[in-house]
């Protein structure tokens, strides 16, 4: 059976399920009004109606270019040319009297520009938003981080983890149920190499490894770099790696026991590191358990039964189980095995490839193998949540564990270099389970993180003049070249602490440290999230440590400013409740919005109230940068508001109530957006 690799296939076809939300945003409500008007006027059902937000409020709050599409439809139906502007005029008349709309204009060749009733919109935006209803109707499994448990995690791993964690937060913000998985490749080459290092370079026994009292993942970082040099000195030593891999896959013996200890201890270090930036996990599935619990064997048999794979009997892949590509698939035959047209699932030496094990794991994710792991607690977080780890030992199974797997969809955060094998993983899963769950699943690809030349030199690496002229230099674990996450956080916290101590000497040491930590996390997470997933990041210490401009601390400071406003108002005995605004008539609110500075005030309200639209756009595109950009925009808008309007000294009670309401909305939405980004604003900065 030939499996077609469709290079034009969209991994993002799943977001259709989010387009019928019960809790409608302002854009969706207005879109429905327009859709109903089109049905009444022209008896046409339009499934998709595009809506735009004009760049300036004087041009309207929403713009609908739908008249152009209607003109085409009507011409096709009647054979007569239709004027889009005339169609737009009829639509404008139809929706002009709808509640919530203040004015409708026709602009240009046929745009319908809608101006909202600002007073009505503001009063509806002041109360807390209602809970969001989930749309998918099942659990989404998000797999992220998945750092090889062989050494300390670096900044490139953190981009994966922060993207994944933010995706989880995005999905939960629109009401979805999410299970967070961190797949542990404890039988791969990287773990095997560290085992070789301990056994054949340091010549340590398991007890001696257990006795290492320095930071264990850092020790392994240095050792891993030594192993690369160890192989370079004598290529025959690579046989040690091959032998070790076989022993790891066997799942027993001294070498396996040593590798199991190393991988679990390093994994514990990774969880501690990720917790520093607010990242937690539900379950830690281990690759060794995929192999030893017959999960791979069950999947292997299904793949053979469905004709998805076949045994190659000739050529250089003879003896391998491969997934055949379609004849028309355009792949260079000279490429390495990882990217050749016929994807190897089991090598001729019997070793299952990463792709093969991944297919099995994803079939389990969707509940297609009628088999499960055993589970035991591995790490308990301070909030009581437990990170469970898989095991093959039924005696270790804790029956209190939640039900894992059996998802309605899965999303994998894996770097863009794995796009080709990930395509085959999905094709393998589709060969067994070709339904909506697979269609809704996606590979969240992202570009890697490189280092600026200045950063490399700060790490103590010598560069040639040619390297110094380059914009970015790739990290290399085998060379020990990279920025460890813990080191980076330490530097960020130290820098932030200096500023906090200078500005707030009255705070206790504990409060200063907590504030510095929140600022450091805000700076780091925002730096990694403000770039779109397909943008390569050239990591630079100076830029990451900056607190001005488009940075996390800049946005955090906006919340701090809003909080300070409410503290001062409370100290002055001024009412800041929603009831204060309710005492102001809609007519008076409309006057204030129509008066001097009214457009600026409205633009802040309107931008703040569009958070839900922004979240839905981010979920539909699986792009956290959309939220990051929105947060920065509203922080800019609010800081301008803060400088231009002085609430405490405002003599007009109605105007003051309006300014308080706007501050409350902006603060609430900023805090909500930062929470989705995994950032918390400190009380003071």
Language-model segments: which ranges?
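Non-catalytic interaction-recognition regions
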Residues: 5, 9-122, 134-685
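Flexible, low-complexity linker/hinge segments
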Residues: 127-135
